[in-house]
Amino acid sequence: MLILQGGGSLGAFACGVFKALAKRSIRVDIIAGTSIGGVNAAILAGSKDAKHPEHLLEQFWLELSESFVDFDKVTFPSASMPKVIEHLLLPYTNFYNYFPTPTSKHEEHYSRANDNGGDELTIRMKQLRSFYSSAFFGNDKMFKPRWIQETALTDPEYFTPTKWTYMYDHLPLVKTLEKYIDYDKLQPNGNPNARLILTAVNILTAEPLTFDSSKQQITSKHILATSAYPLYNFRWIEVEDGVYAWDGGLLSNTPLREVLDVSPVNDKRIFLVENYPKRVNALPKNLPEVYHRARDIIFSDKTEHSVTMSKVITLYLRYIEELYQLIESNMDLTKVDPKQLKRIRKKYKKYKQERGAEIKDIFYITRDEPFPHMYENADFSPETIKNSIKEGEMKTIQALKGQIRSM
């Protein structure tokens, strides 16, 4: 199975991971994801190219990168325009108030904050500009800002931003995905490329929502729900009457537990893609890096307890099975109450069915962060997306080195 974390533009890393798995003919029977991981998972599971879903996933990411608007190349109708849009982003920039804005002196700021050389400064500046490009102009293949002029006639709250509950509309993603996903596959008996599991959260109850292609029809609405992250100002989605959903990353950015719950019988070999590293080698050097590391910890993999409990349950089941076989083989069953024996057999089969899966292997494939930056998950620039795909491929090859087997 393949587990894909959320992480905005960092999701391109997972594209490279799957490319490497495909090149080695490693098949996955379950693909689970949340946020952009859910988008990736849906493309792979429902890909119109059944033989090479990795090709369409890469095309998707390249299409997003081609729609990137370079902030430095835009001519504003008014010199004050960047300041106006910047004001709209105050809820975000106030939360991370140590970061520069597009109208502040970037170089001076980072010269004070870091003394690690020009290369790092150049990369950080590029990440910052890429973030503001996405924040100001959106990406017309994935999401659009609510303040753009074309929405003035259709949005009844356009001129009353104090009533806004979101700042970005990701409905453009629906049209983009139509080129890549055959939704007829994403339903029971739909013959998907893999079973698809997406996660979200019920806004009104805080309860987890799990969308499973083996049990229901997965639609674009479910993909929008799993990628509706409110702290990045995306809109909520009504997935069914009265059920309003946000991004599953609010509960867990690594939907392993959900997969173990819905697929409890078959043994598991797991490929877990980490967009946000659990472990780093050094402490943060300044406030931006403090915020970045805190963000990484919030979104990082927290499934160790789930893995441990799964292994404990496996040990218990083996012990129960030994006792059960001992009873069946050595006891005079004519002396046992038939009803009691039936109850024991029923419970044994139930426990084995509900929690019989064993985790055989977990391959952690983790993205590197040579220059930590809060804005890295909003960098959709072509160079960054292509580099992320290459890195995912390379890191997967390293993770599999000497461990490739038939799966």
Question: Residue spans of the language-model regions?
Answer:
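Patatin-like phospholipase
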Residues: 1-34, 43-407
